[in-house]
């Protein structure tokens, strides 16, 4: 029986008496019901704790049998709950004998061998209950042998030191102080101080003995300490000599060795403590609980274990693993790691013991631990134990059932038990074929069984038979059909086509309802896979048969293949939308710059809004009209060059409908009049950081006639001589506008392969208004000249830009010679005449010009010669009008120069006045640009360099230089005009001689045609000669 002192030490409460009223209300807690509940495993941790609290405090506080039943069942499930072991032992102390309490503690240390709290409770019980001090000391030593290396075992060390001090066991106390320094702990520094104190007391004892006996030996504390390694047996001998009745010299030597061992232990522990302090400080829960640990805690333990494995102390690493498995007992990953580590170090017994604890107690419900145990047993050669362990892996249906069966059968195959492997699958299939709810599990088992059968027998027929059996037991299963086709595709070959085709045909022709059969998507996938198989293994007859069935069942797939992919129809719509955005942005920029620009707006009648067709795209006429009437920005008018920025590039790329669209320069206004537009190639130079682009026009031969030309008249004038030609042009233009609309339908289908070249915009000039920076610029780079003409505000006489396309070398045969300005070919021809004899086509011309309106077809038969003189007269009139327009434009340009230099005229429109500094800056910029336009490229570079390095020169000097340069240029133009006129007279003479020969001939039509061809060739040769002479003159 337990003594009264033990009862008092364990519990201060008096035993509670059972109340009779509770007997009737606690029938549900009878032992049989409790055993049934415990065996079912239906209780979780919280329910267990509630049940124990109910029995202890209310129902059966003194029923030791019921308490033992509950505690035994609970601690079997959760053996690491040291608090419940202590409570269970206290119940034994109160209600049973001391031996019963000792038995409980022994079970506790067996279940939780490395738990500091369990050993502390056990030793505290021993100090209070045991009468023999040696029994208590042996219990302390036993516990310290397991947990003495634990970082948190200082509580047990403190309890042991307290007990030894009470018992005055100095020899044992000296040994304990030395051992506390061997491994790092929370109180390592405190233990070292106590060690130094006991060493000092021993030194005083030795000094007293020396004084009494007169021993002259040296003081051991003054000698150098030599650090050497000592075993536990040697340490015990040293302590025995130190505390025993030995001579002073022996005691002094023992004390020196004792101090040396202590210092070595402390230094080593201190170094190790510095390394593990980072891990120890992150441990938040060193005890067991069912609540999961956070990720940081788990990662810290993994890192701590990795350090322990590499440190080199196997015993300390084992203690670290055992300490980790207390809070991490529910994590199988740590058990796997522990077993692998100790097995790699040769501790197979420790590995088996760890696996037994994990698979039977701590994580026994996890199938992975049983699988790991089985593979470990198989690895060590224990096949029977491996089979037993594998039998515990989820034999019940549910999650992981197929995997467990497969692994068990594969293990039997590895062990050579082929029949046992087949039996494993057969037993599992018998379980799954009982109900229809396990059809998916059954199909997966058949797939794995077929693979195992092929590996064992190396026969595709045997494996296919397993799958055919599965298809009969689990009909309309996509998984089995796919596995069967893949198996036969890899191993069966053509001999299995007759076997597989009826099965596939049956599945595809089966009419699926809501509960049976394959879906339409599954059928299509099965049919596609079968066509792959039949294409690989079948004949052409089989392929056509399978393809016909597939198209019949799934016609949409065939249509998709035949139709293919087409480009999106929204590309053109997006292009038109980008055009609209670009045009709106340009208009906004023009409105923004209107304060410093003096551009005269176009008449409202000609500013038409772009219309959209039914598909949301803008018509070509609207786009062309909007583009032609768009006002140029201030930069273009001021500099005289066309600077190509990003917006201009987008504008030209998107608005270029076709090559022929660039050549159309006529636009009918609402008043019936026609405005003429002329645009020439422009040589732009880099200026103000922008990259300018060379304007390059190319002619288009579509719907063009060589005799078509454009009438150029001075602005604001209509001479009587030109009225007849203009009226003829109006009549012809009305008829051709209808044809141009028809020709646009043909041009839409042509690719837009050419980038729209930049054009120099021309705006009309109003009376009394000054256009700031508007002038005529001539450049000599690449033999190109940009001519800008100014016209009146009258809508009937207004000149607009024309998109004439030219190349540097263009040969045309018209009624008059081509006008050339410094190597540039500018085409100017009279209005269309009804006399086709005046239209001489040049067969050797490389590029034909494309005029501003569609051309009418010219009959090939010659007409009466009385129209010849009228055509020549019109040619002379057009030639005179061209040079009259040129002189007028040049005179008007000089007037603008003078007005600009003297004083700026106020704008007619109510606009805010410019700042005087801004006006001066714009004037200087305009004058510098006008100067550089008439210089050679080398001179332009010199002028730019001088302008950057020197201050701006006087305005009068710049104007004087400009006038001199203009006079020199005008003299050159007069010489060139005379040469051109001589060439023109020669050409007219040659044409007159050729036409006179035609009139003298009176041959049939067939011979006339041959002679015309010969004469046209001769005329082409003459034109080539004239062209070469023109080129030479222009180069001069």
Curated annotation (Swiss-Prot):
<feature type="repeat" description="HAT 4">
    <location>
        <begin position="168"/>
        <end position="201"/>
    </location>
</feature>
<dbReference type="GO" id="GO:0005634">
    <property type="term" value="C:nucleus"/>
</dbReference>
<feature type="repeat" description="HAT 6">
    <location>
        <begin position="312"/>
        <end position="344"/>
    </location>
</feature>
<comment type="function">
    <text>Involved in pre-mRNA splicing.</text>
</comment>
<dbReference type="InterPro" id="IPR011990">
    <property type="entry name" value="TPR-like_helical_dom_sf"/>
</dbReference>
<feature type="region of interest" description="Disordered">
    <location>
        <begin position="1"/>
        <end position="24"/>
    </location>
</feature>
<keyword id="KW-0539">Nucleus</keyword>
<feature type="repeat" description="HAT 2">
    <location>
        <begin position="96"/>
        <end position="128"/>
    </location>
</feature>
<keyword id="KW-0677">Repeat</keyword>
<protein>
    <recommendedName>
        <fullName>Pre-mRNA-processing factor 39-2</fullName>
    </recommendedName>
</protein>
<feature type="compositionally biased region" description="Basic and acidic residues">
    <location>
        <begin position="740"/>
        <end position="755"/>
    </location>
</feature>
<keyword id="KW-0507">mRNA processing</keyword>
<feature type="compositionally biased region" description="Low complexity">
    <location>
        <begin position="714"/>
        <end position="726"/>
    </location>
</feature>
<feature type="region of interest" description="Disordered">
    <location>
        <begin position="995"/>
        <end position="1036"/>
    </location>
</feature>
<feature type="region of interest" description="Disordered">
    <location>
        <begin position="714"/>
        <end position="767"/>
    </location>
</feature>
<feature type="compositionally biased region" description="Polar residues">
    <location>
        <begin position="1002"/>
        <end position="1036"/>
    </location>
</feature>
<comment type="similarity">
    <text>Belongs to the PRP39 family.</text>
</comment>
<dbReference type="InterPro" id="IPR003107">
    <property type="entry name" value="HAT"/>
</dbReference>
<dbReference type="GO" id="GO:0006397">
    <property type="term" value="P:mRNA processing"/>
</dbReference>
<feature type="repeat" description="HAT 5">
    <location>
        <begin position="278"/>
        <end position="310"/>
    </location>
</feature>
<dbReference type="Pfam" id="PF23240">
    <property type="entry name" value="HAT_PRP39_N"/>
</dbReference>
<dbReference type="Pfam" id="PF23241">
    <property type="entry name" value="HAT_PRP39_C"/>
</dbReference>
<keyword id="KW-0508">mRNA splicing</keyword>
<feature type="repeat" description="HAT 1">
    <location>
        <begin position="62"/>
        <end position="94"/>
    </location>
</feature>
<dbReference type="GO" id="GO:0008380">
    <property type="term" value="P:RNA splicing"/>
</dbReference>
<feature type="repeat" description="HAT 3">
    <location>
        <begin position="131"/>
        <end position="166"/>
    </location>
</feature>
<feature type="region of interest" description="Disordered">
    <location>
        <begin position="595"/>
        <end position="618"/>
    </location>
</feature>
């Amino acid at each position: 029986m337990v003594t009264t002192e033990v009862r008092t030490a364990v519990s201060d409460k008096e035993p509670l008496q059972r109340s009779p009223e509770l007997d009737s209300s606690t029938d549900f807690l009878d032992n049989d019901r409790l055993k049934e509940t415990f065996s079912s495993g239906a209780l979780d941790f919280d329910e267990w704790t509630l049940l124990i609290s109910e029995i202890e405090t209310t129902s059966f506080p003194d029923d030791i049998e019921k308490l033992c039943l509950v505690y035994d069942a609970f601690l079997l499930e959760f053996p690491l709950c040291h608090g419940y072991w202590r409570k269970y032992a206290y119940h034994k102390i109160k209600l049973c004998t001391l031996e019963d309490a000792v038995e409980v503690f022994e079970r506790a240390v067996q279940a939780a061998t490395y738990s500091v709290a369990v050993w502390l409770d056990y030793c505290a019980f021993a100090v209070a209950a045991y009468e023999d001090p040696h029994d208590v000391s042996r219990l302390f030593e036993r516990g310290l042998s397991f947990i003495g290396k634990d970082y948190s075992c200082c509580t047990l060390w403190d309890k042991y030191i307290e007990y030894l001090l009470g018992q005055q066991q100095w020899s044992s106390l000296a040994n304990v102080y030395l051992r506390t320094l061997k491994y790092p702990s929370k109180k390592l520094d405190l233990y070292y101080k106590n060690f130094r104190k006991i060493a000092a007391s021993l030194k005083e004892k030795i000094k007293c003995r020396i004084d009494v006996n007169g021993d002259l030996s040296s003081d051991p504390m003054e000698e150098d300490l030599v650090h050497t390694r000592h075993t536990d047996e040697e340490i015990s001998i040293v302590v025995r000599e130190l505390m025993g009745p030995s001579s002073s010299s022996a005691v002094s030597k023992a004390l020196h060795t004792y101090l040396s061992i202590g210092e070595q232990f402390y230094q080593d522990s201190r170094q190790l403590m510095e390394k593990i302090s980072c891990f120890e400080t992150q441990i938040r829960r060193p005890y067991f609980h069912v609540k999961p640990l956070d990720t940081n805690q788990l990662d810290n333990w993994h890192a701590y274990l990795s350090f322990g494995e590499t440190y080199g102390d196997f015993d300390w690493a084992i203690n670290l693993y055992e300490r980790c498995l207390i809070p991490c007992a529910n994590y199988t990953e740590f058990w796997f790691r522990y077993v692998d580590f100790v097995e790699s170090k040769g501790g197979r017994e420790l590995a088996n013991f760890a696996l037994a604890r994990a698979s039977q107690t701590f994580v026994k419900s996890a199938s992975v631990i049983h699988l790991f145990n089985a593979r470990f047993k198989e690895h060590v050669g224990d096949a029977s134990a491996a089979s037993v362990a594998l039998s515990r892996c989820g034999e019940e249906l549910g999650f992981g059932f197929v995997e467990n069966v497969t692994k068990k059968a594969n293990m039997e195959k590895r062990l050579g038990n082929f029949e046992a492997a087949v039996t494993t699958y057969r037993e599992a299939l018998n379980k799954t074929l009982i109900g229809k709810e396990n059809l998916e599990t059954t199909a997966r088992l058949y797939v794995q069984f077929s693979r195992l059968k092929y590996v064992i027998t190396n026969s595709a027929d045997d494996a296919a038979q397993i799958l055919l059996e599965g298809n009969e037991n689990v009909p309309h299963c996509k998984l089995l059909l796919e596995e069967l086709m893949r198996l036969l595709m890899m191993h069966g070959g053509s001999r299995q086509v007759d076997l597989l085709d009826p099965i596939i045909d049956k599945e595809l022709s089966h009419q699926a309802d809501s509960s049976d059969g394959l879906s339409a998507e599954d059928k299509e996938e099965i049919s596609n896979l079968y066509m792959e198989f039949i294409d690989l293994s079948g004949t052409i007859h089989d392929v056509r048969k399978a393809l016909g069935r597939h198209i019949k069942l799934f016609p949409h797939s065939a249509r998709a293949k035949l139709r293919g992919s087409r480009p999106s129809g929204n590309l053109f719509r997006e292009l038109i939308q980008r055009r609209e955005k670009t045009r709106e942005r340009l208009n906004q920029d023009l409105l923004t710059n209107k304060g410093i620009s003096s551009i005269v707006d176009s008449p409202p009648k000609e500013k038409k809004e772009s219309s959209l067709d039914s598909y949301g795209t803008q018509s070509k006429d609207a786009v062309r009209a909007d583009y032609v009437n768009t006002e140029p920005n201030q930069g273009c008018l001021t500099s005289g060059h066309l600077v190509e920025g990003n917006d201009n590039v987008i504008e030209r790329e998107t608005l270029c409908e076709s090559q022929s669209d660039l050549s159309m320069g006529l636009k009918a206004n609402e008043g019936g009049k026609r405005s003429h537009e002329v645009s020439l190639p422009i040589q732009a130079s880099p200026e103000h950081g922008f990259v300018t682009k060379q304007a390059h026009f190319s002619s288009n031969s579509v719907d063009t006639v060589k005799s078509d030309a454009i009438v150029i008249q001075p602005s604001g004038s209509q001479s009587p001589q030109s009225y007849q030609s203009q009226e003829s042009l109006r009549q012809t233009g009305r008829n051709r506008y209808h044809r141009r609309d028809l020709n646009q339908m043909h041009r839409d289908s042509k690719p837009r392969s050419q980038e729209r070249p930049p054009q120099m915009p021309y705006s009309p000039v109003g009376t009394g208004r000054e256009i700031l920076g508007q002038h005529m610029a001539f450049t000599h780079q690449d033999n190109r000249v940009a001519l800008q003409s100014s016209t009146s505000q009258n809508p009937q006489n207004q000149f607009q830009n024309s998109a004439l396309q030219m190349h540097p070398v263009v040969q045309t045969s018209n009624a008059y010679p081509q006008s050339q300005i410094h190597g540039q070919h500018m085409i100017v021809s009279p209005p269309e005449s009804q006399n086709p004899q005046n239209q001489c086509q040049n067969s050797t011309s490389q590029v034909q010009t494309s005029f501003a309106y569609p051309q009418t077809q010219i009959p090939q038969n010659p007409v009466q010669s009385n129209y010849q003189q009228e055509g020549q007269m019109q040619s002379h009139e057009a030639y005179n009008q061209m040079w009259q327009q040129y002189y007028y434009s040049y005179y008007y340009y000089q007037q603008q120069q003078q007005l600009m230099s003297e004083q700026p005229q106020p704008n007619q429109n109510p606009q805010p006045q410019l700042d005087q500094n801004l006006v001066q800056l714009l004037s200087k910029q305009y004058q510098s640009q006008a100067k550089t336009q008439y210089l050679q490229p080398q001179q332009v570079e010199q002028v730019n360099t001088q302008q950057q390095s020197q201050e701006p020169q006087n305005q009068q000097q710049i104007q004087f230089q400009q006038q001199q340069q203009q006079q020199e240029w005008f003299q050159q133009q007069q010489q060139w005009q005379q040469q051109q006129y001589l060439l023109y007279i020669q050409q007219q003479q040659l044409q007159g001689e050729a036409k006179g020969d035609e009139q003298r001939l009176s041959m049939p039509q067939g011979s006339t045609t041959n002679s015309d061809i010969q004469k046209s060739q001769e005329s082409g040769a003459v034109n080539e000669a004239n062209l070469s002479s023109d080129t030479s003159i222009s180069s001069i």
